[in-house]
């Protein structure tokens, strides 16, 4: 796709994850002292933002499909900037919760809309999705770092209003870059004809509809199970490292650095997966990723110290590597007119799973220990492998009907 537009979309993915996580750092480093509340008491106020982040994905996708995706991205940059500035004016935890809910509404725009713009077809769509995914991961990684610096140098309110102003400026630049598309109906997408199934080579469109339905069920099933794996590993890794790397270090900062190292290296697995998606298609790539997850989840059971660190890096390569695959398949199959809505459904499913995973981790760890968590994750990887076996070698598209 056009380079300048792709850069804006990548920056948007960075900012989307960045804004959602500012409060977590501000609460930990500053607000506990200013408002005399514990971290555990403050964190529930962030739930309003996360609920809006998931809940409003569907209407955001619907608006993008009905109006203009470029227009919705302009709304994203301006809206998330203004509401983040609003957070900086809060004088109580309740006011922060209200403003974070507003931030979540605008944050919900990015995934269904940005991915629908990137996944327009073309020979390098897999790589484009993968690169965009890395930008999102960097937003997660840098949120705590940049927020901490701003809190130390200026104060917690600056951690919200400075990025907010920056986002508004980026939104203005985006408007001038995309103004010819912002107020018009969707343009026709690029279609990579080499990857499509020719209708003349199929018995009839009824068979293709059935195939699309079957593949869609696999996509949404693996989306849910992959979300268990991704959330289960990324959320639990800090505590897992505290228990399993005690022979290496007991320093919280060193353990945090090791976790950041694993996440940073593993996130670039998306680039490799993206390139493979463009070359050999999603089925083989998904099977490889599922096998990597299954093998290293099982190997992690009972392991400690340096061996545990190495195995953790390997299964995180699988956890991050799976991220572009379902997005790639949706981009290949979904018709342009409703692609943003399909991506919205995908992220609503992921969000619903995330809500369940955190209590699951707590229950399993409290009653059985982390070894049993990895048995569960291995079963998840095996179920993905079995589901992916049923996929066709070439994906059907709605254009074939």
Feature-to-residue mapping (PLM):
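Interfacial helix-cap and linker-helix signal at transmembrane-aqueous boundaries
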Residues: 31-32, 63-64, 146-154, 241-242, ...
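Conserved MFS/SLC helix-loop-helix module at the cytosolic interface between two early adjacent transmembrane helices
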Residues: 55-93, 277-280
């Amino acid at each position: 796709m056009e380079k300048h537009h792709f850069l804006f979309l990548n920056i948007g993915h960075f900012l989307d994850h960045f804004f959602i996580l500012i409060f977590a750092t501000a609460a930990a480093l500053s607000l506990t002292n200013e408002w005399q509340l514990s971290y555990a008491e403050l964190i529930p106020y962030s739930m309003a933002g996360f609920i809006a982040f998931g809940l409003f994905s569907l209407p955001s996708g619907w608006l993008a499909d009905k109006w203009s995706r470029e227009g919705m991205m302009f709304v994203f940059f301006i809206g998330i900037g203004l509401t983040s500035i609003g957070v900086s004016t809060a004088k109580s935890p309740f006011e922060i919760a209200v403003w974070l809910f507003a931030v979540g509404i605008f944050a919900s725009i990015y995934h269904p809309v940005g991915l629908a713009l990137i996944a327009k077809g073309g020979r390098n769509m897999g790589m484009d999705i993968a690169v965009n995914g890395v930008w999102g991961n960097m937003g997660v990684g840098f949120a705590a770092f940049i927020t901490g610096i701003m809190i130390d140098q200026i104060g917690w309110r600056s951690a919200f209003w400075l990025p907010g102003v920056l986002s508004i400026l980026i939104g203005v630049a985006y408007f001038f870059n995309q103004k010819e598309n912002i107020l018009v109906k969707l343009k026709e997408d690029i279609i990579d004809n080499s990857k499509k199934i020719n209708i003349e080579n199929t018995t009839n469109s009824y068979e293709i509809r059935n195939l699309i339905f079957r593949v869609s069920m696999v996509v949404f099933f693996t989306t849910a199970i992959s979300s268990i794996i991704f959330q289960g590993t990324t959320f639990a890794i800090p505590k897992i490292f505290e228990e399993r790397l005690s022979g290496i270090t007991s320093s919280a900062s060193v353990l945090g650095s090791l976790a950041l190292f694993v996440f940073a290296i593993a996130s670039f697995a998306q680039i490799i997966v993206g390139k493979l998606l463009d070359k050999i298609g999603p089925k083989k790539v998904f099977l490889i990723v599922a096998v990597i997850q299954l093998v290293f989840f099982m190997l992690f059971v009972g392991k400690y110290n340096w061996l545990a660190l190495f195995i953790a890096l390997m299964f995180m390569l699988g956890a991050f590597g799976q991220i572009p695959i379902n997005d790639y398949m949706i981009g290949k199959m979904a018709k342009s007119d409703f692609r943003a809505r399909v991506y919205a459904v995908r992220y609503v499913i992921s969000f619903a799973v995330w809500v369940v995973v955190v209590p699951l981790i707590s229950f399993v760890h409290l009653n059985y220990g982390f070894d049993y968590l990895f048995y569960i994750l291995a079963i998840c990887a095996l179920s993905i492998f079995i589901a992916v076996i049923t996929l066709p070698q070439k994906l059907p598209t709605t254009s074939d009907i």
